[in-house]
Amino acid sequence: MARSTSTRWRSPRRRWTGCAQRALNTDINDATIRLLTRLGCDVVIAEGQGCCGALTHHMGKTAESHATAAKNIRAWTREIEGEGLDAIVINTSGCGTTVKDYGHMFRNEPLAAEAQAVAGIAQDVSEVLMKLDLPDAAMGQKVAYHAACSLQHGQQIKTYPKDLLKRAGFKVVEPVDSHLCCGSAGTYNLMQPEISGQLKARKVETLEMTRPDIIAAGNIGCMMQIGSGTDIPIVHTVELLDWATGGPRPAALDAPGKREVPVPILR
């Protein structure tokens, strides 16, 4: 679901391309590459990488999710053993949570050592950016930050995205229920649409109560879920940081209105 990039710090590092984000919003991936490159990273996309296996893992399809994950493990291992990697950078937190769990997922399988090595260098893009010299800026827009469950609870990354947005000059606010789910939750919005819809309505209401210019999030699933319920533009955190440091204005800011949520085909 994410895009992952591997980066070597020229500071080298790397990234990866996830399946849903590639289809739903390629601007996020483009912004990630631009920003990391601008900050001195050598960004590469490992040949053979693909879906992290998160969605099928959520659905209990263990064999299918492990087969998908194994392709990534092999692809990244080739890079690690080749020119080397400092990090596997992931810009969708739902995928990041899964990749960081590869060591546990494969603990009793032949790829156990390789899976543990991959999981050990997997990082959310906000973790990487906190280690780089992101310049200060003075953007000024009021941004309501939505903390994805997979980021704040799954990965225990609670402050980095907000710190980075503040450094870029955005006025950051949060909804009163910032610790609660928006209802996307992997495949939950597909399997339990009624309850998911209630969670979405509550989250949209509390975000709109902050009267922001922009809503920011770090997970494509949350962005699609919340964006389908509000006219306030919702933008990935990395797109805002890219814009603040010289990149293009995010396209979502010029296309307000509720976004239709595409329904994926789940085998």
What are these regions (language model features)?
Residues 1-267:
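Iron-sulfur cluster-binding electron-transfer modules in prokaryotic oxidoreductases
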